[in-house]
């Protein structure tokens, strides 16, 4: 009685493993780049969304709404890299006080470095939707530079124009490349 056996020979198995290892070696680094790109774009979108929320709430409520960097997602701090807070700034001092309504707080932003340019630790949207930085009515444009572990080559910028509208860009306001 002849029994036919099904399966792979050792040579077929070794060839399959070799092809698989080549594909993994080529594919994993590009997957890592895709993952880093997605983290950066996601954080950019969250920050732009927070700016759009602040601007629209300032117009709708006819009040000043402030965004500030935050270390604990509850109070204003010295860094934007740990997160930020969006709040209705009733007294216009640029700080979250006990009676002010927090509209959004963001933390854990995927290990990115966020550096504000032109508006320091906080900026405010006025009831007309225009931006004001550091309580200076003339400071009405600015940018954020967002960097990850890949450095300046992959940095992105959020540019806020004089009307207060934020947009993501590969370049600074003046057209130069961002620096991390």
Regions inferred by a protein language model and the residue ranges of each:
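N-terminal helix-rich module
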Residues: 2, 26-42, 46-48, 52-56, ...
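N-terminal single-pass transmembrane signal-anchor helix
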Residues: 1-31
